[in-house]
Curated annotation (Swiss-Prot):
Protein family (similarity comment): Belongs to the complex I 49 kDa subunit family.
Protein's gene: nuoD
Location of the protein in the cell: Cell inner membrane
Subunit structure: NDH-1 is composed of 14 different subunits. Subunits NuoB, C, D, E, F, and G constitute the peripheral sector of the complex.
Organism, scientific name: Prosthecochloris aestuarii (strain DSM 271 / SK 413)
Protein name in the entry: NADH-quinone oxidoreductase subunit D
GO molecular function, one term: quinone binding
Keywords tagged on the record: Cell inner membrane, Cell membrane, Membrane, NAD, Quinone, Translocase, Transport
Its job: NDH-1 shuttles electrons from NADH, via FMN and iron-sulfur (Fe-S) centers, to quinones in the respiratory chain. The immediate electron acceptor for the enzyme in this species is believed to be menaquinone. Couples the redox reaction to proton translocation (for every two electrons transferred, four hydrogen ions are translocated across the cytoplasmic membrane), and thus conserves the redox energy in a proton gradient.
Enzyme category, top tier: translocase
Membrane topology: Peripheral membrane protein
The reaction(s) this protein catalyses: a quinone + NADH + 5 H(+)(in) = a quinol + NAD(+) + 4 H(+)(out)
Coiled coil: none
EC numbers: 7.1.1.-
Length: 400
């Protein structure tokens, strides 16, 4: 107690001014303090630890520490055959497992140089866009609850449940689907799936617009996110950002449009970038808006696929799948537009084994999180929650 009093006395100077008046000068300088957020913290969206250096309430540096969810995916991929890797891929970005399977199968099929049945291509895009909407609903709902808005969280998970039911009906699983296989799919759509999906599209379109209004017209939500975590477009490109993070900085880049795969070239959709009317381009609010706009675009793509998809007529989605996959010697990089950005797989084959020599995953979450120092510098400690939520990380993909 005595030491505290001495410290206070040293920081306060009383200067006599005459006539009984004095001037009190206070030394308000502060020392740098290190603050840990996580790995068990409600704002980190998983087992992430941020080591924050702070000057008072202002963050001067934030260093992310990773690896708490490391599960040796890339090493496992070297001892499992090509089809057996699909369930491991599911467990990377478990909120968008269909999209992860799609990216991996694109890479292997590129190495095999096989042609995919046209109906399967439409099936893949439908389930991937459904999963994209479900993933964005989790991102928006948890972002809202991070900032204190509970009602949008309930709305998001209410509507997400419809998608989970559709994907479970198609694949037999609610999350880790193992549905998109190399050369095809595990099952054809069940009877009535097309009609039920069309019903969902009609149901959810007004709900998606309602959700946009619920948050973007909320004064508190806007004040917590607008101008927070700014990222200029050139810096975003230099960091290797992709997906909603890059588009939130005003860069119009989407693999489905600019490096198209599957049947995306046949679909009419626009790349969502903020216009600057509701947000400062490059801030946390812009990244949120991109995800909100993308859900509406995904509905349009699903609708187009339902109209164009060939009829089943006894179709077997496993017809083009080889019993034993042994690609020719070579290497390949395949990528797809995941809800969080570009997910890519670099695969090396020796031409002899049914297992890859090397399978390297390019995680969009890992790349996006690498810019945490840039995003957090000069921000207040409470605003770190808004910044982390705007990145929309899944630690299963970051740590692998």
């Amino acid at each position: 107690m005595q030491e505290l009093e001495q410290a206070v006395n040293r920081s306060v100077r009383v200067i006599p001014q005459g006539e009984g008046r004095v001037t009190i000068e206070k030394d308000l300088s502060s020392e740098e303090m290190i603050l840990n957020m996580g790995p068990q913290h409600p704002s980190t969206h998983g087992v992430l630890r941020l080591e924050c250096k702070t000057d008072g309430e202002v963050v001067t540096e934030a260093e992310p520490y990773l690896g708490y969810l490391h599960r040796c995916f890339e090493k496992h991929a070297e001892v499992v055959d090509y089809p057996g890797i699909v369930p491991f891929v599911d467990r990377m970005d478990y909120l968008a497992a269909m999209n992860s399977e799609f990216a991996y199968c694109i890479a292997v099929e590129k190495l095999l140089d096989v042609e995919i049945p046209r109906r399967v291509e439409f099936m893949r895009v439908i389930v991937s866009e459904l999963n994209r909407i479900a993933s964005h609903l989790v991102a928006i709902g948890t972002y809202a609850i991070d900032l204190g808005a509970f009602t949008p969280f309930l709305f998001c998970f209410r509507d997400r449940e419809h998608i989970m039911s559709l994907l479970e009906w198609a694949s037999g699983a609610r999350m880790l689907y193992n549905y998109i296989w190399i050369g095809g799919a595990s099952f054809d759509f069940p009877p009535g799936f097309k009609e039920r999906t069309a019903e969902f599209v009609n149901y959810f379109r007004p709900k998606a617009l309602e959700l946009q209004r619920l948050l973007t017209e909320n004064e508190i939500f806007v004040k917590r996110t607008k101008g927070i975590g700014m990222m200029p477009p050139d810096v975003a490109v230099n960091y290797g950002w992709s997906g909603p993070m890059l588009r939130g900085s005003g860069v119009e880049w989407d693999l489905r449009k600019h490096d198209p795969y599957s049947i995306y070239p046949e679909l009419d959709f626009k790349v969502c970038v903020p216009d600057g009317k509701h947000s400062d381009i490059g801030d946390s609010l812009s990244r949120h808006l991109v995800r909100a706009y993308e859900m509406v675009e995904s509905l349009s793509m699903i609708e187009q696929c339902l109209d164009k998809m060939p009829d089943a007529n006894g179709f077997d989605p496993r017809s083009a799948i080889a019993k034993r996959i042994r690609p020719k010697a070579g290497e390949v990089y395949g990528r797809a537009e995941n809800p969080r950005g570009e997910l890519g797989f670099y695969i090396v084959s020796d031409g002899k084994s049914t297992k890859p020599v090397r399978c390297k995953a390019r995680s969009s979450c890992f790349v996006n999180l690498s810019a945490m120092k840039e995003l957090s510098m000069g921000q207040l400690i409470p605003d770190l929650v808004a910044i982390i939520g705007s990145i929309d990380i899944v630690l299963g993909e970051v740590d692998r």
